[in-house]
Amino acid sequence: RVLFRSVLSMVADGGGYGVPVNFVWDGARSVYIHCAPAGRKLTAIEQNPRVSLCVIGNVHLLPRIFTTEYESAIFFGEAHIHLSDEEKMRALHLLIDKLSADFKELGDKYAHMSFHRVEIIRVDFTEFSGKRKKVK
């Protein structure tokens, strides 16, 4: 199973602010990110919902030839918070399917039990760019 590294970036306190996140794609044009129900990330999104998500795939350092193989993509869009309870629970189930697929029943119980301690961010993307370097 591949777990991509990702960083959600936004503007906070007049400057750039990036945090590592777990995300799940909804199969269309949005991703969901889970977080605590309060904090700097949510405050920043309330002030300016325009964000980017940088996703880093496979990275291989090739020291013998002084280069690195990599793949990455950056997505730009608008973040939405204060989603309906139904959408939040659907997002939590998508995250469980992605991150804990072998524990769906337990994940469902946990999602219901901790629902009040979780916020969900939906990011709707408007554009993206990707880059890859593969050495032959």
Predicted regions and their residues:
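A short mixed-secondary-structure module that forms the rim of ligand-binding clefts
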Residues: 24-61
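Short connector loops at helix/strand junctions that flank enzyme active sites
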Residues: 16-20, 26-28, 46-50, 68-76, ...
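Short, small-residue-biased leader/transition segments that mark boundaries at the very start
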Residues: 2-3
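A generic local structural motif
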Residues: 18-20, 38-40, 107-109
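A sequence-level detector of short linear motifs
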Residues: 18-19, 33, 81
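A broad, low-specificity signal marking well-ordered, structured residues that form hydrophobic/aromatic
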Residues: 6, 21, 31, 51, ...
